[in-house]
Amino acid sequence: NKKTGRPVYNAIVWQSRQSQEICDTLIERGLNDLFKKKTGLIINPYFSASKIKWIFDHVKTVQDDANKGDILFGTIDTYLLWKLTNGKVHATDYSNASRTLIYNIHTLEWDDELLKFFNIPKSILPKVLPSSHIYGFATALSSIDMGFNTIPIASLIGDQQSALFGQCCFDEGCTKSTYGTGCFILMNTKDRIIYSNKGLLTTIAWGLDGKVEYALEGSVFVSGSAIQWLRDGMEMFKNSSDCEKAIRGENPSGGIY
């Protein structure tokens, strides 16, 4: 809520499938190709748009407050930026915007046609800026004795895109792989928007020096989280490192594969 600063609902994690029905309805209408062409993504609860619609559909007062201009949306970077600047800056970068399923990666704008499918008002969306940019200053920290009054907030970028940048994958074809909760492979395609017919996503890598670069991404949602489930849910071992013993054991898959 723009006036109170309080979230209108709990943050919805990327793994959540609670908006699956919303996505299924759009897929049944044959809209997957349209969304892929404009956003590089597939219709999936993984992305923000269906989560936003779910909140509008299920949380009382949100629609009325949005009509009054009192509702703001943001991925976690936008929310943290807004909090750190004491509500002065409502923005995101190209890489995070490209993961919402409502951002056109060709025109670099929130897409009016896609917004209508989710009944999302454009007024709630953040301004999209380069990944390297002075967004504002962390005035919320000015009351803390840190030796200076304000800290400049000079960058926003998505997590996997930041890993691509951090691994210095600046050339076309350079690829990185990250293993964590899930597994994610990203390949820099520079200024080329490349569509895959093998299930890869097309996304914005970052926006720097007045231009946008793109990437291809392969996503596996469950990897490290499977180890955590085996440890905490199935109680097959006490420490995550113990899973290696089971993996290296004789016929660990029981002939399944």
Task: Cite the ranges covered by each PLM segment.
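Active-site core segments that coordinate phosphate-bearing ligands/cofactors
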Residues: Q20, I27-H90, L101-D112, K116-F117, ...
